[in-house]
Amino acid sequence: MITKRNIPCKKNWKYKKKSISLTLITICYMFLFLTSCKPGKQNSINLLLLLLNTLDNKNVNEKIEDSTNTDPSSNVNEEDENSINANANDNAPSDSDSSNPRSPDKNPVNPTSPNSSSADIGIKILSHSIFMAPTNLSSWGDLGQEERAQRIASSSYIKNQDIIVFEGLSHNNAEKILLEKIRSEYPYQTNVVGRTKKGWNATLGAYTTSPMANGGVIIVSKWPIEEKVQYIFNNSNCGQDQYYNKGFAYVKINKDGKKFHVIGTQLQAREPDCFNSGETIRKLQLNDIKSFIDSKDIPKDETVLITGDLNIIKGSNEYFDMISKLNVNEPRYVGVPFTLDTKTNALAAYYYEKEKPIYLDYILVSKLHAQPPVWQNLAYDPISNTTWKRSDGYTSYEFSDRYPVYGFIYADSSTPTKSGHKRKYDQVSFQSTFNRKFIQADHNKKDGWLKADTRIKTDFTKFNLLQENVSESNPSCMNSGSVRIESSYYLNYYWNWFIGAASGDYGYYTKFNNGSDSLGIKNLDNGCLKDGSRVAFYDWDTIGGGYYYLTVWDKGSWKEHLFLWVQSFLSSREIFYLHLDSNPPKDWSKDLIYHH
């Protein structure tokens, strides 16, 4: 009974002591705060800190002594989060005192965990299928391969990357031009997949020397490549792909001591000659990739990236099968909505005119290996600063039929935030001063008649202007002179005039890859073409000779059609207002994730 009476007495005294100590501490802190603004305060502050330290040590000792379940030896180096000393240290200035570093995170991320996110992991990778088939395959022929290689090499969109994977680079001269010109920035380079066994640490799969073309995949890097393996797919490709040594390149890259494993590939193309558009073959090729990754026994704390032209439509059943088969996470998609876009990319529209826009290119991260905190895929639509020409005169500013894709953790100042495909003189419209109606292409036929017959702007009233004799693809100022006028809705369909045995001679329509060579635009207000400029169009009559102006026909069944008719005098039927497109380029800056 005596013991029971003594225990509560002891506790009450203990709490009283604590209450007194806390009261003294509070008073000291208030005094410390009040003196902090006065001159000659340092001696007072030192005295108070000494008192606080004494009180704190006393409290800590009492805690240890009074605990019935504490092993004193286990608490010698343990920090008490609620101790006065800990709070005092946190409140004291630390940026100028290296002797008092902040305590480490009590729950650090395990960098070896497959699902961990390491703050210091960082890689920037670009994938681009650049459509450079060899000329010995007659179905492709001249694609401006060497001209485009020159422009890609000097472009800004390939700058500031750690790694680039090129696909579709099977043209030998174009390959030499491109790789040599970017060697100073990307000195570590693989050979192209499927051409030779030289330069590889290993060649696996069904390599053969008989195909007409190599596999077209090349990886270049800013950082040392420690291992290079080429793998040729173990299945028979179909359609055009049967002539290629298709497979993938594997590289192990050392970036400042960190290892990154990259697989770059171009899977079976989506061809109508193939059973189910080649899906069965692509599944087998994905199996080859997954089996190879498994066989490498890559450490779980190293990043594995699978990238390239996978020819699998985003959002399709095949896409989700791919995500599952490769055991990868879906990236965060930003940028333009398609990588093969027949509505915006003239080269894609030229060769795949009947295809709808689709997304086919990816940079994916293996789930079984190191995981970044976030992984973004940005599809971007750059154009060349200068135009290029094919041997037949076809002129373009596209780098490829595909748009490139960037893979990265966090966006930075070099990350594209807006569409690069918006030229100043794209999607312009022309309004007749005669009837106040806009010129438009036919709604039902790509090669239909041009008419000034609508008061409403639509996709059919928009046209792209290009002066083929000017090398600059996107001039800030376009003057009077020869011009190619292309329907913005029907890419590669240009203004031309008709001549034949039927009615409609000298009437204008849009014709595939065949614009009038002598068509010109005249700015009646002089200077640069700008919004609201009054313009007239002229062309050469190859039948009767001489230049004539285009006019809006004003009667009969051909009313409101455009004809090459007036030779000298300009009336309201020959004059049009030019309207520039005021819509801003697509902006995805708010969709990007930046590191804060």
From Swiss-Prot:
Organism of origin: Leptospira interrogans serogroup Icterohaemorrhagiae serovar copenhageni (strain Fiocruz L1-130)
Keyword field contains Hydrolase: yes
Bias kind Low complexity: ranges: 83-118
Signal sequence residues: 1-36
Keyword annotations of the record: Hydrolase, Secreted, Signal
Chain spans, region Disordered: 63-118
Catalytic reaction(s) noted: a sphingomyelin + H2O = phosphocholine + an N-acylsphing-4-enine + H(+)
PANTHER family to which the protein is assigned, alphabetical: SPHINGOMYELINASE C 1, SPHINGOMYELINASE FAMILY MEMBER
Record's compositionally biased regions (Polar residues): 67-76
The gene coding this protein: sph1
GO cellular component: extracellular region
Localization annotation: Secreted
One GO molecular-function entry: sphingomyelin phosphodiesterase activity
EC numbers: 3.1.4.12
CDD domains tied to this protein: nSMase (cd09078)
Protein name: Sphingomyelinase C 1
